[in-house]
């Protein structure tokens, strides 16, 4: 922990096409080995194709998807008297967004290749549309996190 107080969060510049910070965060999460132009192409194409299917603006679509994937509660391990309890805590706004984007990209990457979903563009598009309709791997991850937190509410008095 730094001695000179809390570290201020870094400012992320908005993406060049839509001027939105959330799109830039998604691009950064999709990026592999520093290939940003490839990540931009994947994200922009997937967003545009998904938005075309549901007649929405791509940025509006992404904001709705992230809103549906943001977890309100999560569990954190807490050691009390030799036993480790899973203590539910409320998730701060910044972490909610980070987790939602992380789960979205992770679910798209883990999606099985097949049934017309071979490229990352197709898998990300499918995951975006599934999350919008409250289905898919990312939404299941959010539900699982909430279920764990709800099941462990008995230990909420151990919150710090």
From Swiss-Prot:
Molecular function terms, GO-annotated: mRNA binding; rRNA binding; structural constituent of ribosome; tRNA binding
Entry keyword annotation includes Methyltransferase: no
Database matches in SUPFAM superfamilies: Ribosomal protein S7
One annotated Gene Ontology cellular component of this protein: cytosolic small ribosomal subunit
Gene3D superfamilies with a match to the protein in the record: Ribosomal protein S7 domain
Signal peptide per UniProt: none
UniProt GO BP: ribosomal small subunit assembly; translation
Pfam family, one: Ribosomal_S7
Keywords per UniProt: Ribonucleoprotein, Ribosomal protein, RNA-binding, rRNA-binding, tRNA-binding
Top-level division of the source organism's lineage: Bacteria
PROSITE patterns with a match to the protein in the record: RIBOSOMAL_S7
Subunit-level organization: Part of the 30S ribosomal subunit. Contacts proteins S9 and S11.
NCBIfam families: rpsG_bact
Similarity field: Belongs to the universal ribosomal protein uS7 family.
Its job: One of the primary rRNA binding proteins, it binds directly to 16S rRNA where it nucleates assembly of the head domain of the 30S subunit. Is located at the subunit interface close to the decoding center, probably blocks exit of the E-site tRNA.
This protein's name: Small ribosomal subunit protein uS7B
Gene name for this UniProt entry: rpsG2
């Amino acid at each position: 922990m730094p001695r000179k107080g809390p570290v201020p969060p870094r400012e992320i510049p908005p993406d060049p096409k839509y001027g939105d910070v959330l799109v830039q965060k998604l691009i950064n999460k999709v990026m592999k080995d520093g290939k940003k132009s490839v990540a931009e192409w994947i994200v922009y194409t997937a967003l545009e194709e998904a938005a075309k299917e549901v007649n929405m603006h791509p940025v509006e679509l992404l904001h709705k998807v992230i809103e549906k994937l943001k977890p309100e509660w999560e569990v954190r391990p807490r050691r009390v008297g030799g036993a480790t309890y899973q203590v539910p805590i409320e998730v701060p706004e910044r972490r909610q967004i980070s987790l939602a984007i992380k789960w979205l990209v992770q679910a798209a990457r883990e999606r099985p290749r097949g049934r017309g979903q071979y490229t990352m563009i197709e898998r990300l598009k499918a995951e975006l549309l599934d999350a919008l309709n409250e289905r898919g791997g990312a939404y299941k991850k959010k539900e699982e996190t909430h279920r764990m937190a709800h099941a462990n509410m008995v230990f909420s008095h151990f919150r710090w």
